[in-house]
Amino acid sequence: GFVFVCLSDSSPALPDYLGEVSAELNACGMADLRFYRRMVYDLDCNWKVFVDNYLDGGYHVPILHKGLSNAIDYRGYKSRFGERHATQYCEMSNDNESEETRRGSMANYIWLYPNMMFNFYDDILDTNLVIPVSENRCKVVFDFYFTEGQFDDEFKEQSITMSDRIQAEDEMICLSVQKGLQSRAYEVGRLSPEKE
């Protein structure tokens, strides 16, 4: 399980804060998952740049993540938004190569405000915790979980290798965005009149 800590007396109780995320996490079979490994990435970008990249609705997946793009059916990519979370989901493809690292029928990506992500591929989960370090740096902690008894170590290692490759691709784009934000040419744009 997970431990959530709040240092404020005025915050809502955890079930109220999680809202429908609780049901979504339970539906993904978290009770059967077992921790396997942790990887930590230090990124030279603001933590919100990483979160924004995660929440773009899969827009960058077919362009930037060829391996992941083969594993999921991007044409059916959908997003749902709640008060303190966003869920992105799509069906997995039947690509033989992707079966070496991802299995199942659905990919579910759940973001919990402000800095926690849950990435489910049926019997596989990786969590991402984004930790601000400074204005232009963050740390991202990846924890990998697999359903007990379902996968051998070779499959787990291949799955983590694919995740590491995806992270390297995301890091490249996040660093480019951060560089653009620091450019003299950058001007803050308008907020969305419809959403903000």
Where are the regions that the model predicts?
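C-terminal catalytic domain of Rieske-type non-heme iron oxygenases
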Residues: 2-196
